[in-house]
Amino acid sequence: MPGQNYSTISEFILFGFSAFPHQMLPALFLLYLLMYLFTLLGNLVIMAAIWTEHRLHTPMYLFLCALSISEILFTVVITPRMLSDMLSTHRSITFIACANQLFFSFTFGYTHSFLLVVMGYDRYVAICRPLHYHALMSLQGCARLVAWSWAGGSLIGMALTIIIFHLTFCESNVIHHILCHVFSLLKLACGERTAFVTIAVILVCVTPLIGCLVFIILSYIFIVAAILRIPSTEGRHKTFSTCASHLTVVIVHYGFASIIYLKSRGLYSQYTDTLMSTTYTVFTPFLSPIIFSLRNKELKNAIIKSFHRNVCQQSI
């Protein structure tokens, strides 16, 4: 990192919940704490159920395990710090800690998006090219897809962190967000390169997300076309049910992201902006294990079976 950044600003203030009345914060803290704990527990239960149920040792559930890991790490990077700030009057974060939070949040966030693409591709191959499924979705092939997803997320996280923290911050050190968010940091930057860097950051942030969304949409166009060719209603329903949980998570993932990043800034108060930012950082990870466990019959049965097995072992 260049020395000028350290000489101008050595720490940032996360404004986040500072504007909220103190009476509201304990209730919000309890709500977000419960959602955070449920997110961790839900994803761990999913991973444990897949690990113990040999019938679920398939590519689709391997990708789901990788997705659960990315969600746990994404949540751990953001939520504990947010909860700590809600009950503290000292909401400063050091320059290095801010850079680390930016890197890891974007790494795990983009890894999550890439894994959703991989899961969509898995469903496309299973439904549209079933005869080639085992060849295309071998253990080595699945491992490569997961590795590429993590590598892609890490590359984007590293690129954004390097770009942002090579800027000069000299206007203010107050970040109007609950975390070190890239666009909130750009507002604090000054210098001749800021406008150019802003355009570059937008391209780096938006292009992969649009690419992922387009790939998922194309996958489902082919999937729906293949399902409509199935003669029986029961067959169509059974085939589509294998995609329902993934499609729902994609809609939630991109739906909340669109609401946050495409909304008009002038229409919302600081309270609303802060609460809306938590929909993507807290609420979306909270919903994901619920959707997968409720809308996936095999996984739901595996979780129930694992629960009964543990209860029986403890009662003996």
Swiss-Prot record:
InterPro entries cross-referenced by the UniProt entry: GPCR_Rhodpsn, GPCR_Rhodpsn_7TM, Olfact_rcpt
Molecular function in Gene Ontology: G protein-coupled receptor activity; olfactory receptor activity
An annotated GO BP: G protein-coupled receptor signaling pathway
Residues on Extracellular side: 1-26, 79-100, 166-207, 263-273
Annotated coiled-coil segments of the chain: none
Pfam families: 7tm_4
A cellular component term, taken from the record's GO annotations: membrane
Localization of this protein: Cell membrane
Cytoplasmic side, ranges: 48-57, 122-144, 229-241, 295-316
Spans traversing the lipid bilayer: 27-47, 58-78, 101-121, 145-165, 208-228, 242-262, 274-294
Main localisation: membrane
Glycosylation sites: N5
Topological type in the membrane: Multi-pass membrane protein
Keywords, sorted A to Z: Cell membrane, Disulfide bond, G-protein coupled receptor, Glycoprotein, Membrane, Olfaction, Receptor, Sensory transduction, Transducer, Transmembrane, Transmembrane helix
Keyword Membrane: yes
Disulfide bonds: C98-C190
Main function: Odorant receptor.
Family label: Belongs to the G-protein coupled receptor 1 family.
Matching PANTHER family: OLFACTORY RECEPTOR
Protein name, as recorded: Olfactory receptor 10H28
Source organism of the structure: Mus musculus (Mouse)
Gene that produces this protein: Or10h28
